[in-house]
Amino acid sequence: FMRCAHYQDMEGWPDYWLGFPPLMHPTHAVAPCLMLLGKRPETVYCKGSGRVRKEVEAPYGCPYAFESALISLKDSDVSIEMARFLYHVARGYTESFNIYGERKSFEWQQLESEQPVLFSMALGANAEHVMNDYGRGGLVTEERIQIPDYADRLPAEIGRFTKQTVYDDSNPHLSFLQGGGHGGSHPHLVHEFVRSILEDRTPVPSDIDGAYWTGVGICAHQSAMDGGVVKRVPVFE
């Protein structure tokens, strides 16, 4: 099972964001889950929650403060829970994903100043569960982990941009003020795209990947507006 979210208060952003439906642009949340699984979303259903004020609802006609969806995948028994809000929720910024497996699970940090948590199921010599001290339930350990920077995988000329940017206190940009520079991903994306052109191959992520990442959110929002009706995600190949 996987869970992903993008929480961000958009008050004061440019007018084109005013009232934007939460899951119409879900890529910051769902992309890591779909990329890690290597699967395509097949169906999705979604419910809206809470109401925004009238002037926020007016531009796009979306009344919901929060949208949460459940995604089924083609040729997979894994489901993904996806959630996003943009207005009227008292919660700090995060772009996060959690992964729950039989032997290990990963949870994004609750606060951006913290580190993520890795949970591990203790296993015996024959891969059997080691029981906890009470004899009920397996023994699970947890540890805070440091995610590597991976700047060493980039040319030196752009590797520094995983942590530094062309923006500073005198020249800020909102994606860094609230988005933390998207985790240092910008130079990795640029490098991969340029290399794909030089090597005459499809980049990772591809245009088709992007269509699914965006399309599943559009379908989710349509589901919410229709009261939670299951929507089938189009095939983009």
Ranges and model annotations:
Residues 190, 210-213:
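Non-catalytic, hydrophobic alpha-helical segments
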Residues 80-82, 106-109, 223:
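Short hydrophobic/aromatic-rich beta-strand segments that constitute the beta-sheet cores
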Residues 1, 222-237:
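C-terminal capping/lid region of NAD(P)-dependent oxidoreductase domains
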Residues 7-94, 98, 112, 208-211:
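Rossmann-like dinucleotide-binding domain that binds NAD(P)(H)
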Residues 37, 190-201, 218-225:
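Short, hydrophobic alpha-helical segments
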Residues 80, 201-205, 226-232:
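Core catalytic loop region at the nicotinamide-binding pocket of NAD(P)H-dependent oxidoreductases
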Residues 53, 57, 62, 70-75, ...:
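C-terminal glycine/acidic-rich active-site capping loop/insertion
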